[in-house]
UniProtKB/Swiss-Prot annotation:
InterPro entries according to UniProt: Beta-glucanase/XTH (IPR044791), ConA-like_dom_sf (IPR013320), GH16 (IPR000757), XET_C (IPR010713), XTH (IPR016455)
Region of interest (Disordered), ranges: 306-343
Presence of keyword Secreted: yes
UniProt entry tagged with the keyword Secreted: yes
Function: Catalyzes xyloglucan endohydrolysis (XEH) and/or endotransglycosylation (XET). Cleaves and religates xyloglucan polymers, an essential constituent of the primary cell wall, and thereby participates in cell wall construction of growing tissues.
Sequence similarity: Belongs to the glycosyl hydrolase 16 family. XTH group 3 subfamily.
Name of the molecule in the record: Probable xyloglucan endotransglucosylase/hydrolase protein 30
Spans traversing the lipid bilayer: none
Enzyme Commission number: 2.4.1.207
Superkingdom of origin organism: Eukaryota
Enzyme class, broadest EC rank: transferase
Biological processes annotated in GO: cell wall biogenesis; cell wall organization; xyloglucan metabolic process
Disulfide cysteine pairs (residue numbers): C280-C293
Length: 343
């Protein structure tokens, strides 16, 4: 069976497993005015007439971004996002939570970062987390997507509670971090705001900086809509902490806070098919895995000691055979299937 056929089967299985178990059917969506504020590049931030969506532009002069009007002590942060098309090398679109403006040396952060690519190559993305300024202990995972994120809107979400963090793409949980005592202050614990930005990261974003942003294709436009923010809104510097127990109870009662058996199977398949780097398997960087790592033998066997995918063997031979037989470069492991039967 070809790599392309396998990917299409993966997508169909996702549809069948998750169609009736959506974690996002009853989200309370907000307008820009009632939940968000411009962060920078105001002229490159374009709000829709109904105030329910916003376009972030990057040109040769500046990028742009927005921030939530409030900070939250734990929360659920979600938006439908459509990424720029065509040549996007050097471009980064970020959807993340942070408190770096308040706690500069001890900040917490939860990241979803989309990394642009040259024309004909797919967007990649990565997730990461920091607690209490632990930026020297990066916890990156990097992935491909099973769809073209520049063709349609897809929902990207971050859940953060005192006990767990879940990153979602549409109805698929792609990463779960369970807090344990050994993580200590590395687990994010201080109030955070939501951020979304588009910016030029030509020095590292695409092939380690080999390919730069090309402003012949500007403006690069990222679109956001259907914002959802739930959590305990707090003042991060107040002397008496607020009681957020009711808010946490609400978060943990929602469907997006738990992963059912079908979703867990989808997460396992996603990670087996589309994750191409994990810090948990990077034994050169971390000879002993960090305490939250759950080592999955089926995953570990696919990675080198650098935490990157092994290339070679049967997969490499299959890719070469497919190229010879079908002469379709899009079936290489680095490409994304273009399938309209998505969730």
């Amino acid at each position: 069976m070809s790599k392309s056929s396998y990917n299409h089967i993966f997508i169909l299985i996702l549809c069948l497993c998750l169609r009736s178990s959506s974690a996002f059917t009853n989200l309370n969506t907000l307008s820009f005015e009632e939940s968000l504020s411009p962060l920078f590049g105001d002229a490159n931030l374009v709000r829709s007439p109904d105030d329910l969506s916003v376009r972030l532009l990057l040109d040769r002069y500046t990028g742009s971004g927005f921030i939530s009007s409030n900070m939250y002590q734990h929360g659920f942060y979600s938006s439908m996002i459509k990424l720029p098309a065509d040549y996007t090398a050097g471009v980064v679109v970020a959807f993340y939570t942070s408190n770096g403006d308040v706690f500069e040396k001890t900040h917490d952060e939860l990241d979803i970062e989309f990394l642009g690519n040259i024309k004909g190559k797919p967007w990649r993305f990565q997730t990461n987390l920091y607690g209490n300024g632990s930026t020297h202990r990066g916890r990156e995972e990097r992935y491909r997507l099973w769809f073209d994120p520049s063709k349609e809107f897809h929902r990207y979400s971050i859940l953060w509670t005192p006990h767990k963090i879940i990153f979602w793409v549409d109805d698929v949980p792609i990463r779960e971090v369970i807090r344990n005592d050994a993580m200590g202050a590395d687990y994010p614990a201080k109030p955070m705001a939501l951020y979304a930005t588009i910016w030029d990261a030509s020095d590292w974003a695409t092939s380690g900086g080999k390919y730069k942003a090309n402003y012949k294709f500007a403006p690069f436009v990222a679109e956001f809509k259907s914002f959802s923010l739930d959590g305990c809104s707090v003042d991060p510097i107040q002397e008496v902490p607020m009681d957020c127990s009711d808010s946490v109870d609400f978060l943990e009662s929602q469907d997006y806070s738990s992963i059912n058996s079908h979703q867990r199977a989808a997460m396992r398949r996603f990670r087996q098919r589309f994750m191409y780097y994990s810090y948990c398997y990077d034994t050169l960087r971390y000879p002993e895995p960090l305490p939250e790592c759950v080592i999955v033998p089926a995953e570990k066997d696919r990675f080198k000691e650098t935490g990157r995918l092994k290339f070679g063997g049967t997969e490499a031979r299959e890719r070469r055979r497919n190229r010879r037989q079908q002469r379709r470069p899009e079936i290489e492991i680095e490409s994304d299937p273009d399938d309209r039967k998505l969730l």
